[in-house]
């Protein structure tokens, strides 16, 4: 299964929507679906879908089709911030993620690390919409108000962790699939609490939006395992973020480059 074949498979499931257009981007290895009426759409990273398809077959395709249908349906609606304060959250994206909508409207975002940015989203139940300047103007909200509410809300999310051990290293995973697993990297009290549990070096990874990995690295093998694990999650994610990991020291995140059994910062 290659990217062109996956594009055709997804398109076949969506072509009944007569107002939608489909475009295959070979350079970006992606698929773009847009609604002609609203000029809005969604971009799908095809390698992640293919990786899931090898494990889940048709279920992986159904998941993407559902995501596209719900997202474009939501874009037809007029979303408001006022009255939806509990549904505003930060989302983590790669540093190369667009800073404006397809219509040229600036998105609300902050720099996070050299590899990541923080965007802000209005949760709409089955999907969400990234908050842009036009939404702020419409509801007469300030950027600071959105950010404050989003940070408060992400701290209120539960942080259940699953644990795995490899060669004396401990790996913790937050994977609730609520769309904001990676966002929990912004919960400073949670990270501080995990730091207290870690016996070795603490590393953190957000390979895609639906997982947060915290590693208790106690030997060189731990760095190799973390690198392989992060790359695997990154390749299989519907919304990939970064294949790099971060050292967590004194409340700060610093990207680490893992080569063989050595690390470089």
UniProtKB/Swiss-Prot annotation:
**Pfam families from the UniProt entry:** DUF1444
Reading the lineage from the top rank, the first entry is Bacteria
Q: To which protein family does this belong?
A: Belongs to the UPF0354 family.
Q: Which NCBIfam families match?
A: PRK13668.1
Protein name per its UniProtKB record: UPF0354 protein GK2818
